[in-house]
């Protein structure tokens, strides 16, 4: 069976999803999984994330080190998800057990952007036009921005 995905935005979309499920013939030897979840982060949210991370990486020295945007992403996602660390295989460092931002729901991603904004603002980050616009849209339109 091919994978079906429905974005339910109206009663008509909802009925289409219900109809698709009703067409499935149950087979106890080959169960089908139906998952209902909030949609994952959008490409627009991802663009906003990297604009903000770039600003933080250029302006914030973290414990005597300048981190790149990718490293900051790890720091922020670890803080948001209260993640854990484990020793690396060589035993000379640590690895953060994390969550991929591409798997985050829209609301989780919005929380991540809020965390970055609060952190950067506390440290006097001057937001670039792209990041500032992204943060203003988030403030104005909420998670849909």
UniProtKB/Swiss-Prot annotation:
Gene3D superfamilies: NinB (1.10.3790.10). Signal peptide: none annotated. Belongs to the ninB family. This is Protein ninB.
